[in-house]
């Protein structure tokens, strides 16, 4: 018989990038007494990965739990970026309700829509938390209207439309049920969660059933499966059967060696756990997302949503440039292969396969440029050295044999005086303008339907066009018929003619031809790209050239040569910049752009074909 666990609430926190959900979880942890009074707490404690802290984004879902009065609240912090949307869908299987965090100034953004749609489809209870209400330009009343409009657009039922609203400033540590209430602490949000989110239910006497929703990885115990116990209970040393809804051939008999629940930011070992609890199990070597842990006598798999397919791919290959192996710790094909396949343990939206017909090369597919650039940055920090190609979209074909390509819905906020150039550029990239509305502060919001490949390499150009004041957000929409060819880069490259060290005299002559990416003293090799040509063709330049010494005195003393500071490209800018016949060489210390074919004559022959 089904019973409710009134002492547990399972919630997910969902929001758009940078609307403050991780800060909100920090504040809930602090005010529930999870940390000791004298304990130093890092800001945004939930983002444990360096890149997450630096970029201010959440990449992997995190689990934590707090105790409020006598209720244990399991909280899952989900990524807000569309590239990590694969994480969100699965995590929602574990919870009975969501707290939707919306910025009091920015209002509803595309990712809010993406995640909310998933939550409403699964009939989850929603609490709307309007955050950052202490911002001077906050407009909470208008944002409430925007949210209700969004609910109606997403076909929410009456019960879902009648959701509670909470007004908060996670940074200042207070929440209110009404804008006129006293600004005290987070208690109104705690009460709202306990009173409005249903308790998990299940049958404690039935056979065990638990769906694995996320995978954690630990060097000591290996793979750890995390999920919610739907029925029955789990005990340490219990023998269970692993089955999978989409793959009936999976049937494995295994033993649970360790069982953990969550408390604060820590995993706590327990001997037994019952229905409604979110637990982690270790000791099962090849456990995967979507597997169901069942009792031996009645193994029934729980159905689950298949993970969204990747839309972009890049080739990762062994670095074969003349400077290969000088800066990295892990440089061989085996190192690269092991690291990429290890990433599959934790990142389920990723696909890795060996590139057919190409030695030492792996095709890595993901949900977007950010998804793959985070992987590249992580590997770089770990000491790996490799080369990557330009991102390409993954095409499908329909039943009539027509080519289909992934489409994105892009929301773009730009200053009013920049709208013309942005619309023109996106139209050239096969974008279709769907809507244009003025918003506060002299900005216009543009809505485009655009092929995913139209956005590859555009973000850097966009920031230049809007003088750094534009915001661009996009979410995957689906596959449509191929829209035709897009010409990407309008500029050619300045290519190094010979190998050696860059010298001021050579750079001084080269800088007249375009913008340089390198400074004096840097090592270069023939075929490496050292700058950008304002015209469309590639030009070879000799940056290692020295001044010829003669025994004739100069009529005027040599003037000191003045170099323009080089344009140093970040990882994202370099990935945006490279063309289809180029590679990005990634090492722990450097990023170098090069031609795929380094030799000048061989490259000339290949281009003539």
Named regions from a protein language model:
Residues 1-102, 106, 146, 215-218:
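P-loop NTPase switch module centered on the Walker A-proximal segment
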Residues 209-314, 324-326, 337, 491, ...:
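Conserved nucleotide-binding/hydrolysis modules and their immediate coupling elements
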Residues 41-44, 154-166, 200-211, 240, ...:
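Interdomain boundary/hinge elements
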Residues 78-84, 92-116, 120-142:
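Conserved Switch II/interswitch segment of TRAFAC-class P-loop GTPases
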Residues 233, 285-286, 366-372, 416-419, ...:
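Helix N-cap motif at beta-to-alpha junctions
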Residues 169, 356-371:
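Short glycine/threonine-rich beta-strand-turn micro-motifs
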Residues 125, 135-195:
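Canonical P-loop GTPase G-domain recognition
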Residues 262, 267-270, 404, 450, ...:
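Long insertion/accessory domains within large nucleic-acid-processing enzymes
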